């Protein structure tokens, strides 16, 4: 049985992943079937705010899930509740205590006094956004509490979002702290809920509920708090009954309209890879290797 890392965590279902024993800021588990990954922020005392170390660990776990051929779905969530006040959070964004003039700074402690002056600041949470966006697997955000600032942007970039009815809270704090997510967190968010709603969320920076997020189209489902992770697992298990190739191509197709040439390249590259499996592509390869003209006669100009 796994260690109980969160009140919503089912220790009988999940097992820690080998090679990830030294994590400080997140937890990383696979379900007993080895097909679903659970990646969770684990700084509940600061509303699961991230620092550079958090992002390093998050990227490492997500990349491991991406490259594991058995994993089909990733559940991204936040452990809790806070030992300080019992509050819940998915992720409240960057830890402002260690934000410098050049980004978020590496620190040995929890305050600015521990900042490592020899290392540049980072904003590599954007690399995590792109990893979630481009991985050919479904990423479900299970939001047990606050999704604010950079945490709000992370739920936006996930493929699906399920939120706690009792504790799910959303707020885009960028304009309050002199920051702005000018990519997926804002422009793609506007695609999801419409320009007027997105501008309201950013410009007014007000808290809004899980139900309001659902009504705007930012959340797929609002469920009782105690059922949040079980619902995410249920959705994941349903997705795992589908064709892996179809899910992969559908995700890239949905992305392509907003991702420009990068999205087109990903979709076209996957299409090319699939085409390599046809007899027609095999004939093209073999004719080249055999130094002869290809024989396309068996292949009709289909319509």
Language-model-derived ranges and their functions:
Residues 201-202, 253, 257, 270-276:
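Helix-loop "lid/cap" segments that line or gate small-molecule binding pockets
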Residues 53, 57, 124, 131, ...:
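Charged catalytic carboxylate motif
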Residues 39, 43, 57-58, 76, ...:
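Terminal peptide-recognition signature
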Residues 263, 293-303:
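Short C-terminal tail/terminal secondary-structure segment
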Residues 130-244, 278, 282, 286:
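Crotonase-fold acyl-CoA enzyme core
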Residues 46, 78-128, 178:
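Glycine- (often His-adjacent) and acidic-residue-rich active-site loop
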Residues 1-84:
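Conserved CoA-thioester-binding segment of acyl-CoA-metabolizing enzymes
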């Amino acid at each position: 049985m796994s260690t109980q890392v969160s009140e919503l965590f089912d220790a009988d279902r999940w097992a820690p992943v080998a090679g990830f024993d030294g994590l400080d800021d997140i937890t990383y588990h696979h379900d007993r079937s080895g097909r679903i990954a659970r990646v969770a922020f684990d700084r509940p005392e600061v509303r699961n705010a991230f620092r550079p170390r958090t992002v390093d660990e998050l990227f490492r776990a997500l990349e491991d899930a991406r490259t594991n051929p058995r994993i089909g779905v990733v559940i991204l969530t936040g452990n809790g509740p806070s030992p300080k006040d019992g509050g819940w959070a998915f992720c409240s964004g960057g830890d402002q205590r260690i934000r410098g003039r050049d980004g978020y700074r590496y620190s040995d402690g929890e305050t600015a006094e521990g900042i490592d002056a020899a290392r540049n600041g980072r904003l590599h949470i954007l690399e995590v956004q792109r990893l979630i966006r481009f991985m050919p697997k479904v990423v479900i955000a299970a939001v047990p509490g606050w999704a604010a600032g950079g945490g709000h942007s992370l739920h936006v970039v996930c493929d699906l979002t399920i939120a706690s009815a009792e504790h799910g809270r959303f707020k885009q704090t960028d304009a309050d702290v002199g920051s702005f997510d000018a990519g997926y967190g804002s422009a793609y968010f506007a695609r999801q809920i419409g320009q007027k709603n997105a501008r309201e969320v950013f410009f007014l920076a007000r808290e809004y509920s899980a139900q309001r997020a659902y009504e705007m189209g930012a959340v797929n489902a609002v469920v009782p708090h105690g059922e949040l992770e079980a619902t995410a697992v249920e959705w994941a298990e349903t997705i795992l009954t589908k064709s892996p190739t179809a899910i992969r191509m559908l995700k890239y197709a949905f992305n392509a309209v907003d991702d420009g040439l990068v999205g087109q390249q990903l979709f076209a590259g996957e299409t090319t890879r699939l085409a390599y499996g046809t007899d027609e592509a095999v004939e093209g390869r073999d004719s080249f290797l055999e130094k002869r003209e290809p024989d396309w006669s068996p292949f009709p100009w289909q319509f």
